[in-house]
């Protein structure tokens, strides 16, 4: 049972603790995935979000649903947003995202089957395959998205 005492920041962990009853509360974290998909022709699947003014390329991304593994989320988001299947899903890196407790988990994957894109126009304004030479220079390295696209462009993803 929880008491009504005001909680304080724990000195050892990122949590709140009640000094009276010892109850601990960890922050809620919302995991999301982002995936860099490549094909056998050395192309990267890039996207642009629908209804956004930023004219930068992005990658397929989305939040993990309850009861879903990260890898299942990668498969589902790709099928929902662009209608493709992938294999060889591999962890790349992660990044705390925003101030609301999101955690972006990056993956790489290989196209498995057709490269035909079936765009979900409610989510995306554009999705296409680009070679490294077709990707514009990236001077913003603040996000996992930009890092992954840049690393593909320079052959080190």
Q: Which sequence ranges carry the predicted segments?
A:
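Active-site-adjacent beta-strand/loop module that shapes the phosphate/pyrophosphate-binding cleft
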Residues: 95-118
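Nudix hydrolase/Nudix homology domain
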Residues: 1, 53-57, 121-157
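Generic recognition of flexible, low-complexity loop/linker segments
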Residues: 93-95, 132
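Short functional micro-motifs and their immediate structural scaffolds
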Residues: 5-8, 26
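N-terminal strand-loop-strand
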Residues: 12-59, 63, 85-86, 109-111
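The catalytic Nudix box helix
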Residues: 58-93, 107
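Cys/His-coordinated zinc-binding microdomains
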Residues: 1-4, 22
């Amino acid at each position: 049972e929880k008491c009504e005492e005001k909680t304080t920041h724990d000195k050892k962990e990122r949590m709140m603790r009640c000094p009276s009853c010892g109850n601990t509360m960890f922050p809620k974290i919302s995991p999301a995935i982002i995936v860099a998909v490549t094909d056998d022709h050395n192309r990267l699947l890039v996207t642009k979000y629908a209804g956004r003014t930023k004219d930068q390329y992005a990658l397929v991304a989305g939040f993990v649903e309850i009861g879903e593994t990260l890898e299942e989320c990668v498969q589902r988001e790709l099928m929902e947003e662009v209608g493709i299947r992938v294999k060889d899903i591999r962890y790349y890196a992660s990044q705390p995202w925003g101030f609301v407790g999101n955690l972006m988990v990056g993956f790489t994957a290989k196209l498995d089957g057709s490269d035909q894109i079936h765009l979900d126009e409610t989510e995306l304004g554009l999705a296409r395959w680009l070679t490294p030479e077709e990707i514009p220079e990236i001077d913003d390295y603040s996000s996992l998205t930009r890092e992954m696209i840049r690393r593909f462009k320079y052959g080190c993803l």
